[in-house]
Amino acid sequence: MDHMKTLVLVVHPNIESSRINKKWKEAVLSEPDVTVHDLYEKYRDQPIDVEFEQQQLLAHDRIVFQFPLYWYSSPPLLKQWFDEVFTFGWAHGPGGNKLKGKEWVTAMSIGSPEHSYQAGGYNLFSISELTKPFQASAHLVGMTYLPSFAEYRANTISDQEIAESANRYVKHITNIELNPKVRLQRYLKQLESVDLT
C-alpha cells in the first residue's frame, strides 16, 4: 500500500472546551488524504446516518477513533455508533466482511499520568488492557488493530506539550509503516535488492 486514505472519527462531546482533542483535530484538517469526521458535530441531535457512515468506512483504508478516555472507555456516542454502523451481515456475521483488511487506530487523551495505568497504579490496568473491547471489535470485523496513540496528563499538560503532541499525533496516524506488515514488505524488498554474491 503506497497510498493510504485515513478517516479520523472525532468523538468528543464538547470539542470547543477541549485542549488536546481540539488541537489534534485542527492538526489533521490540513493533511492530504485525511478526512476528519466529528460525530458529535453531526449527530448530537439527530439519528446516525448508517449508510453514510458505512460509505465513509468503505472509502478509507485506515480508521482512527479519536476521543477522550471517559470512565475507562469512550464517550457514549461512539458506542452507539458501533452498535448502529457495524451491522450484522455488513461488518460481521455471514457476508459481513466489508471492513476486512482495513486498519484501526485508537487515539485517546487521558487525564491521569501514564504510571497510574499499570498493575499497582491508581487505575490498576494498562491502557492496552482497558482497550481490549476495541481490540476485540477490530478482530471481529476483520480489521488490523494498530498501535494506539495516547496522551496522558490531559488535565495538566502545557500548551507547548499539546502542540508537540499534535505533531506526534499527525505523524502517528499518517505513518503507513505503523502497520508491521507494510514495514515487513519494505524490508523484504530491500533484502531482494542486496547482492549476496
Swiss-Prot record:
Query: Which GO molecular-function terms appear in the entry?
Result: electron transfer activity; FMN binding; NAD(P)H dehydrogenase (quinone) activity
Keyword Nucleotidyltransferase listed? The answer is no
A Pfam family found in this protein is Flavodoxin_2
Query: Which Gene3D superfamilies does this one have?
Result: 3.40.50.360
Per the UniProt entry, the Enzyme Commission number(s) are 1.6.99.-
Q: Cite the entry's keywords alphabetically.
A: Oxidoreductase
In Swiss-Prot or TrEMBL terms, this protein is called Uncharacterized NAD(P)H oxidoreductase YdeQ
Is Oxidoreductase among the key words of this record? yes
Q: What's the family?
A: Belongs to the NAD(P)H dehydrogenase (quinone) family.
